[in-house]
């Protein structure tokens, strides 16, 4: 994987986020991969990764692992990835951090301030 991010829930009362919470207000959608690697739009499979993608800039999208957790969400960007996918990774991370009131996230094992994530975009 090219990049891995972990966002911890900083709220006192922890509850998992719904996909509609995350994609609301953006041109993002989600789905899971079927047995043949095709995107099954709008479906959530708790046994596999969830894919978030930009409906206007299709690339590989962002994988959300452990998406049913109320404590931490694991985002992953796989190679090859488009520039749009890289930017979207950080936009999704910022959105989740905002919803969970998190000020820091882990980027490839390094603690980063959410307000200063732009320097992580290569």
Regions found by a protein language model. Give the residues of each.
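Acidic (Asp/Glu-rich) sequence patches and key acidic residues
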Residues: 1-122
């Amino acid at each position: 994987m090219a990049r891995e991010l972990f966002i911890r829930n900083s709220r006192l009362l922890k509850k998992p986020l719904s996909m509609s919470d995350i994609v609301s207000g953006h041109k993002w959608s989600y789905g899971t991969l079927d047995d043949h690697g095709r995107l099954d739009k709008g479906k959530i499979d708790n046994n596999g990764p969830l894919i978030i993608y930009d409906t206007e800039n299709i690339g590989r999208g962002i994988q959300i692992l452990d998406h049913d957790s109320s404590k931490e969400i694991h985002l992953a960007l796989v190679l090859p990835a488009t520039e749009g996918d890289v930017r979207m990774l950080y936009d999704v991370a910022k959105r989740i951090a905002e919803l969970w009131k998190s000020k820091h996230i882990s980027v490839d094992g390094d603690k980063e301030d959410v307000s200063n994530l732009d320097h992580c975009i290569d």
